[in-house]
């Protein structure tokens, strides 16, 4: 691969051994493709039938009015251009969305009174505005009211049919009761279940159960039809009073002991004697010979069988037996036959009786028994029964019942299986219905019951509902589609009513439609759905992970309380689809998961993972994506199976997975092999080096804590990485990539201007301007700041990283810092995972981060008059106003502390009635400062920092103050600068093309002084201004046309640029849309640098976390033999019990990387002294090894090599991919090459005494993160603050400026000490004794020290509660009694 500019800057030594044939897919593909499909925009594939906005409109329209004289049809829809771009929406607290325009057609019919025939009377088409449709930003998020939100994908049970049993829990006998459930995408659920007596019942929507035959009758089957559907028929033929002749099935007698002799009906010989076991050999012989087809069975053997058909007297129509009736014989005392249905049949000459083939072993009589219990016999009564269950209390009629039953399962408006449901149902029941058949059919219901009965008979298996073939993912697009459908259906009702009530001939479609419900549904979904979440923006990794999250919670999903262990557990089908490691600790464990690195979601919503195809033991490079169901049919080998250089398996037996089991299989039988070892974990887990050496619980914490790492002031990529850091940085959108190749034209901290050299289209200026995000606040108050990595004049290729973002370093994810750590105790300061740090870390800002807080204040129009933002605040001294400008708004750059005023604001307060004197004074001196109170925005306790940005928003038509005008001027200047740059590059490009077109051609005429027919040369052009070049008319017709076209293009682009500029300026100058009642709004952003200090939480990448206990002077820290003091001391006891040995390997590997870097550094110093490059080349070869050197480094020229070497002097970065990284031997080898001992331990000296420690200590380089749990955000103390309204007790929590609860146990402690006065104080004046509180304040002010406690307010609350129960309770004073 061609080394990009950045790759040359810093090479990573790669330890992976397995060649990857497939590049990791884009990490936020899930979000983007799903929403593209919904909007049917971009280059997304065509959606399936009825998907996306189009599908929603098609399913709701056409809308007919109640008497069908008019129809409203949907023609097409179109999304217009969004009014504001992403940036503007974030600044103005708006939603990033595009107006949705729908073309509707209203058709009015004329109905002939007599014939009822319809003829079209009128057709009207019109574009109707249907509200705004939120758009997704390029990074897969949504901007809603100015904040970035993510819609998390939901895992839910796939529609289709599921078979299950109750695990023997329902009935005391422990008998398994089987059940079957048909789950549609939307519509009524249909359940079938057995009870303990083996009767089959059906339930609709979990209501009262009905015998299943009632449902079958309602479907239009009769008794014979039902028997036919579920049982085979055998005939019993009477043989001259000797017995019955019936077909013989040899299989059924295998291993049984017959109760009677089995006699061949044809020959009369006994083929098996009664009471003797029939051996399998005998059965086999009978099957092979095949001579015995019928048996002769005893006469009374027919008793207890059931008739398969109605047997009727053809002439009289009398029914002897009905289908399903039991056949009986009755004998008297002497054993003579006196009655029974069989006698009646024989007497009437029926000697061939069709009987249900039920043997109670292979086939049970469940459906027949159910039918016998069912009191319904026909469709009408069955329908009425169903109606009574569904609509209890309403009088049933046959018509209503029939209509209800039809709409339940067979009406596409009310019931939708969805394409997925239909596919799953066809697969499970072996049906062949078309994918477009989205409702149930009669055959489906019959097949479900049949499969359920077969399960009860012991055929087939129940389904595993946690199998990923039975759970699917609903992504943004689909969730949004469901929500929009709900909105449109609400709208449909209103439209229908309006169509009936208005004069239909005169209205247009616009008059019928009120788009509010649809717009409201969308707004509600994005604003308050459980799945629409505030984006976790702490660092780029947390963004990516949030977008790849899969939640089982949410509407239509599980709830935390109801979810059992099975749902949360890791399932074999998760392999390569969902990460087994990354999930939250706590109540949501296992319910919220992360998509695996290579996984993707297919069109049906099932998660697929890629495999390479294996043919005859030979691994090919062909890659197939498989869903969990497809994978069950294959044998899959692990990615680390040993292959030879041609890709053939080395071992005869290979470790494989087959249908969820792990087996050793011969290499010929292997069909697939994993694409990569990291395909089974998520992005966060695959960022942990040596993950394979960590315990899973700690790996889980490691993955979760990386997401909480705060972006530091200077990012530093890990020395020991895994090789996917670059992928995360780019896909998260933190680093900026070049959209197309070009040359860097100009650059400053705010933007990069690139002159494109490729992908130029006609009418394209060929300029790309990339704006950096400078010190913006993220959702989590961390700082987003981008800085350029390229230089002017440099050539960049498409997709190259041109700017770093937060937590990225040279295009790689960099969440923390590489620091020197020693695993050793130090005076007990690392007890219980505490961390001891050197003062250097705090002094050199190693772990310093910037945090930005946003404060806003709004001036409203109140009943008493408008609030005003001003510098003129009553009773506030000049000192407090020192940071405000004349408009009353704080300066940028002001240092502020708690209590400082940021924005001065006054609010009018109710006028007290004026005395005559005041009236007189006011009449003389004019308007006195009417009563106002100070409601300024002040800095909250615990916040301090520097003001970095101020934004002022004004309502339309409100005069702008000086500050707002100044901000506006700056913004317009910035836009003008952009326009001028684009224009300059456009000029340069166009004139260069013009010059190449006209040089050497002949001019027919031109401006003054040009002779017709003269040749155009460089000299001639220099005598003219560039604008005059266009006046040169060329000789050739074609040439003249080309120049003309170029000129037109130039003018067109200039006009487009100007128009775009004017539009933006207009947006800046126009007033803002503020909430009702708000006249003006000011936002102030304060940034603060937070250094590392005791109480801050830090963590490594292996789940090793701790809190800083002490900052030690650098000279007191333990130091190495060369005098280097260590930066961190960690507790060695934190490793063995937690089994995250990966951190130790990382420490050793980092130490080796640093040693090799120091070697390169020495070689560079030698080169600077002598000018000889050989030592540098040798050092690089030594550091990277022969192969990498030959491939990437040997061909570099001097400057490039020196730059590449200069970038690795702090340490040679390495990549050790998960499950395929450096082994122990590699670590030893690296340590040896760096010149260290393979134990990885060094001799340390005590910084305070200078003495050597008793034994060598493990010292190395470790990558540590500072987490978003900073002590500054947690520390808090209450002085006097707000009280709860009812109980009058102080509030709790930092946000409420609350106190610490003095609880029950603390009271016991004071009681135990007998500290009565302290206790009384705690329970009264320091808590909720309102009168006492004020008295104490007074006495303190007066300097007295005695006070009385009164009655606590909570006691009054108790008294009121008791009175509420109707018991009068009063407090009486003891003295008064006397």
UniProtKB/Swiss-Prot annotation:
Annotated catalysed reactions: RNA(n) + a ribonucleoside 5'-triphosphate = RNA(n+1) + diphosphate
Record text on subunit structure and interactions: The RNAP catalytic core consists of 2 alpha, 1 beta, 1 beta' and 1 omega subunit. When a sigma factor is associated with the core the holoenzyme is formed, which can initiate transcription.
Pfam families attached to this UniProt entry: RNA_pol_Rpb2_1, RNA_pol_Rpb2_2, RNA_pol_Rpb2_3, RNA_pol_Rpb2_45, RNA_pol_Rpb2_6, RNA_pol_Rpb2_7
Keyword match Transcription: yes
Species of origin: Ruegeria pomeroyi (strain ATCC 700808 / DSM 15171 / DSS-3)
Organism lineage: Bacteria, Pseudomonadati, Pseudomonadota, Alphaproteobacteria, Rhodobacterales
Any one cellular-component term (Gene Ontology): DNA-directed RNA polymerase complex
Transmembrane segments: none
Annotated function: DNA-dependent RNA polymerase catalyzes the transcription of DNA into RNA using the four ribonucleoside triphosphates as substrates.
E.C. numbers: 2.7.7.6
Similarity-based family: Belongs to the RNA polymerase beta chain family.
Biological process according to GO: DNA-templated transcription
InterPro entries: DNA-dir_RNA_pol_bsu_ext_1_sf (IPR042107), DNA-dir_RNA_pol_bsu_external_1 (IPR019462), DNA-dir_RNA_pol_su2 (IPR015712), DNA-dir_RNAP_su2_dom (IPR007120), DNA-dir_RNAP_su2_hyb_sf (IPR037033), RNA_pol_bsu_bac (IPR010243), RNA_pol_bsu_CS (IPR007121), RNA_pol_bsu_protrusion (IPR007644)
Molecular function via GO: DNA binding; DNA-directed RNA polymerase activity; ribonucleoside binding
Keyword terms of this UniProt record: DNA-directed RNA polymerase, Nucleotidyltransferase, Transcription, Transferase
Root EC class: transferase
Name of the protein in its database record: DNA-directed RNA polymerase subunit beta
Domain of life assignment: Bacteria
